[in-house]
Structure formats: structure tokens, C-alpha cells
């Protein structure tokens, strides 16, 4: 039910588009051309509260199932959140649309956890998705019946789920053996954009945290470089395989058999010229020999890459792997404990798996981004599993951009054919809602 919406930024309060309904009709009804549907542009829609459920399956061994009290506590938090949205003018009036909720909860996945964390003590994850649908009636057996489905743009408010890498690329993975998922290392998401004082990570997901807590934790340089070494190795191996193919092609091109093959081909296609037109025959022979010399020179040049623009495809990954191996082998314990960062080098040829350098923080200049991983130490197990400790709004950026502290949403077409729904409804609700009340839903 999530449908992407393309938008052009316009400020809220822009000139209203023309509408297709009779302004004197109290419901603003517009019947579709086939007569099977009608849209109620002015009718106040309902707010359908979701029932908290877990569609993701039972918890794995060692994790207790959610108790009735925990389910009640999670549901109370989601109801309090919904009340904040419903308290806005847009959320309370709901002219032309209805709101449908989806309330879900799930358990932490033990194979994802770093060592030292007990899955049974980590909080339950729960969320509420909001789906604004325009009011539509369907004609069934001569009776108009209100529809309660369709497609729209949903946005989820997710509690107790760490934001993770968001839109950052995973730089390296720390393998941990069978039955455990690797730990992912990635650049810290960009938190420079804020809305109402809260960061909008990578311009997409709004994040509310408990004061002083960071949902990411720095990756030690030693761990990061060790995990990244297989990626450097992949690029080195790719370069070596390509070089081996070029060496093979060089040997074939320099062989007497290759020359004989070219002479045989010339004889087959132009041999009659030897007696019919000797001068032309000599010209063909000279041309073939020039081609042979060119092919051999080219094959030798490609099979012996130099440290220049033409040979960077080989030397860049070879040198990068050698440098990373040397740094890892000579690293002191003090160096290994320093935070790591990643310096991207998008222009380097031959770098496909590892498109940059893992370095110690402070050694890569201003372009070296801090490497982080999920911080499960963010959660306080003393608060109880159903306590709200972090909130991520996924994804505010699908519907709006932050411009000078305000949300800029999708522009409305000059002539609306259907009542506005989805992002057209989310954005004004967000602009009108009390985000400090939302923050207060988190444990102090």
C-alpha cells in the first residue's frame, strides 16, 4: 500500500487548484465516467484505529513472548501518538479523506546482535503506519458503499528500531561465523538537516532520541580495516584476473601461429594478386605486417600496465590492497582503538568492491566520514521492554523537504482529478502537530 509520489517543492499555502465538484453539493460528490465510483471531496472521513498485531512470527528461542501488559503499554503509546496527529486541524477535520492505521510489533532478531547483548532484555519494536485515503464510494447492487482501501503514501512512526545505515553504503562487514549475521560498518548518516530541532537523517528519516544518547557507535580503526581487507582483496583479485587474461592474449599474439594465421588469411582472400597484380599484392602484405606489428605492440602494452592513466586499472587496486595490508600488519593497539573513517575515491580505476580508503579518524582530511555501526548499547534494559526509547519517522523525505525550517511538500496539479490523499495530507498534519508532545512519548 506504499506508493511513491513524485513532487515539485512548493510552500504550503500555495494557490488552491481548481476542483471538479459542485460547490453547492454538501459532500462534493464527483461520479466517475463509468458510473461505478464516486469521490466525496467535502465529506469528513473517519479515523480507523489499528489493532496491534505481530505478523512477523513468534520470537526466537530465549526471547519471552510479549505479555498482555506489554501489549497494552505499546498500544497506549501508539494511541497517544495518534491522538497528537488527530489533534491537528488537518487530522481532526479530515475533509475529503479518511485515515487508516496499521499497528505492528516485533521482536529483536538475535543473529543480528553483537556479542554481549541479551536479546531477552532488549525492547520490543512497535510502530504505527498512517494511510490517508481519499473518500471513495463503490456502486454495489445499486447501493453506494464506502471503500476502505486502495493505494496511498504511508508513513510509519517506528519505536525502538535503530535507524541503521539508512541511505549510506555498507563499507565493510565483520563476519562472525555460522548462525550469526555480519556486523555492518557504514558512514554515519548526514544529520545536518533538522526539523523542529530533530535531525532528518540523510534528508529522509526524522529521528527522536532520548537526551544524550546516540543510536550509532564509532567503529574502531583496527576492526574496520580488518573487515575491509577482503573488499580490498576482491579488487586486487579482479585486477590480477584481468592481467592474466591480457598476458594470455599477449602470448597468443606474439606466437608464430598467430602470424601464420594472419598470413594464411591474407593468402586465402588476396593470394591471386601475387601473379595478377604483384604491386597490389605487396601493398596487401605490407598492410598485414603493419597490422601484425600494431596488434603485438598493443597486446604487450596492455599486458604490462605502467603506473600511468592507462595502467591505473591495475595499480590502483594492487597498491590499495598492499597499503591496507601493511597498515593492518603494523598497527599498534593504540592505533587500532582509534575511531575509523572512510575516504571515498570515486575516480580511482579498478576500485569496485572498495571505493575508498579506511583510515583512522583525523588522518583523511575533511572528506573522511566517520564509520559507525548500530549501537545496541543505546537501549536501557532497566526501562522494560515496552518502554519507548527511540522514534524514527520513515520516511518524512518521501513526502517533503525541509526548507528554512518548514516542510515543502508535493505540488498540487492545476486541475485535480481525484481528492488529495497521501503526502498531501501527511505534510500539513506534520506542520501542525506538536512535536514536543511526540518527544514526550519517549522514556525520560
Regions found by a protein language model. Give the residues of each.
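Bacterial N-terminal signal peptides
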Residues: 2-13
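Surface-exposed amphipathic alpha-helical segments
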Residues: 407-444
Amino acid at each position: 500500500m506504499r506508493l511513491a509520489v513524485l513532487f515539485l517543492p512548493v510552500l504550503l499555502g500555495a494557490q488552491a487548484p481548481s476542483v471538479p465538484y459542485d460547490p453547492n453539493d454538501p459532500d462534493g460528490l464527483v461520479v466517475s465516467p463509468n458510473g461505478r465510483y464516486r469521490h466525496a471531496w467535502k465529506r469528513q472521513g473517519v479515523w480507523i484505529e489499528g489493532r496491534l498485531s505481530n505478523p512477523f512470527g513468534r520470537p526466537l528461542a530465549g526471547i519471552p513472548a510479549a505479555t498482555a501488559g506489554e501489549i497494552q503499554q505499546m498500544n497506549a503509546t501508539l494511541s497517544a501518538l495518534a491522538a497528537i496527529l488527530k489533534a491537528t486541524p488537518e487530522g481532526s477535520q479530515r475533509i475529503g479523506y479518511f485515515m487508516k492505521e496499521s499497528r505492528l510489533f516485533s521482536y529483536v532478531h538475535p543473529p543480528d546482535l553483537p556479542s554481549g547483548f541479551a536479546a531477552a532484555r532488549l525492547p520490543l519494536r512497535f510502530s504505527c503506519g498512517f494511510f490517508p485515503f481519499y473518500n471513495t464510494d463503490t456502486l454495489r447492487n445499486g447501493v453506494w458503499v464506502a471503500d476502505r482501501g486502495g493505494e496511498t503514501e504511508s508513513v510509519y512512526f517506528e519505536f525502538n528500531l535503530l535507524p541503521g545505515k539508512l541511505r549510506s553504503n555498507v563499507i565493510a562487514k565483520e563476519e562472525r561465523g555460522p548462525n550469526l549475521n555480519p556486523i555492518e560498518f557504514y558512514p554515519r548518516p548526514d544529520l545536518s538537516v533538522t526539523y523542529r530541532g530533530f535531525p532528518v537523517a540523510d534528508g529522509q528519516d526524522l529521528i527522536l532520541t532520548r537526551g544524550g544518547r546516540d543510536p550509532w557507535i564509532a567503529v574502531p580503526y583496527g576492526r574496520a580495516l580488518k573487515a575491509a581487507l577482503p573488499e580490498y582483496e576482491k579488487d586486487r583479485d579482479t585486477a590480477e584476473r584481468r592481467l592474466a587474461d591480457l598476458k594470455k592474449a599477449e602470448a597468443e599474439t606474439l606466437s608464430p601461429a598467430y602470424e601464420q594465421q594472419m598470413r594464411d588469411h591474407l593468402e586465402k582472400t588476396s593470394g591471386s594478386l601475387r601473379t595478377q597484380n604483384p604491386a597490389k599484392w605487396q601493398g596487401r602484405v605490407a598492410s598485414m605486417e603493419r597490422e601484425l606489428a600494431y596488434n603485438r605492440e598493443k597486446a604487450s602494452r596492455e599486458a604490462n600496465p605502467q603506473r600511468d592513466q592507462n595502467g591505473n586499472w591495475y595499480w590502483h587496486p594492487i597498491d590499495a590492497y598492499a597499503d591496507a595490508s601493511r597498515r593492518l600488519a603494523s598497527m599498534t593497539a593504540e592505533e587500532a582503538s582509534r575511531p575509523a573513517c572512510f575516504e571515498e575515491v570515486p575516480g580511482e580505476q579498478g576500485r569496485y568492491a572498495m571505493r575508498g580508503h579506511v583510515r583512522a579518524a583525523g588522518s583523511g582530511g575533511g572528506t573522511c566520514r566517520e564509520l559507525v555501526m548500530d549501537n545496541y548499547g543505546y537501549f536501557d534494559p532497566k526501562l522494560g521492554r515496552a518502554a519507548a526509547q527511540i522514534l524514527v519517522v520513515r520516511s518524512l523525505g518521501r513526502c517533503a523537504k525541509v526548507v528554512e525550517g518548514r516542510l515543502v511538500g508535493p505540488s498540487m496539479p492545476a486541475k485535480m482529478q481525484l481528492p488529495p490523499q497521501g503526502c498531501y495530507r501527511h505534510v500539513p498534519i506534520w506542520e501542525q502537530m506538536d512535536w514536543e508532545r511526540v518527544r514526550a512519548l519517549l522514556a525520560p
